[in-house]
Regions:
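Conserved acidic carboxylate
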Residues: 12
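A Lys-centered signature of the CheY-like receiver
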Residues: 100
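Acidic, metal-coordinating helix/loop segments flanking the phosphotransfer/catalytic sites
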Residues: 34-52
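Active-site residues of response regulator receiver
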Residues: 56
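Short amphipathic alpha-helix used as the core "switch/output" element in two-component signaling
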Residues: 43, 62-76
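Non-catalytic signal-transmission and effector/linker regions of two-component phosphorelay proteins
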Residues: 1-9, 39-42, 69, 103-118
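Two-component/phosphorelay signaling modules centered on CheY-like receiver
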Residues: 15-33
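Hydrophobic/aromatic residues positioned on beta-strands within the core alpha/beta folds
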Residues: 81-82
């Protein structure tokens, strides 16, 4: 049986950045689901079981630590993104860390690497 494209859940409260991520990942062959809040992200994870979650560390001022821990416990690969300096402190807790602003090519390359490892 043939597997479809790897599903990536983009959890980002900035609609413009969410769109940039979606377009670049879809053009690179990934299937993409989106969430703008932690509640939407939890629902999407339960409904769609993504292979990888791209998680904004600070969603509308809310830290995503709890969701990160839930995803890691479930064995889901997590790429953290953040525009704040504290994102590097999470390197041991996430599968990958991407500091904003990032280049679309960096997003796609990191996503490919994590998808290949899962």
């Amino acid at each position: 049986m043939e597997r479809g494209p790897t599903l990536v859940l983009v959890v980002e409260d900035d609609p413009a950045l969410r769109l940039v991520c979606r377009v670049n990942l879809e053009l690179s062959g990934f299937a993409v689901a989106e969430a703008a809040t932690l509640d939407e992200a939890r629902s999407a994870v339960a409904a769609e079981s993504p292979a990888l979650v791209l998680l904004d560390l600070h969603l509308g001022g809310t830290a995503a630590d709890e969701l990160l821990d839930e995803l890691r416990a479930a064995g889901t690969a997590v790429m953290l993104v953040s525009g704040t300096a504290d994102v590097r402190a999470y390197e041991g807790r996430a599968s990958a860390v991407l500091a904003k602003p990032f280049e679309p090519a960096e997003l796609v390359e990191t996503t490919r690497r994590l998808a290949a490892a899962s």
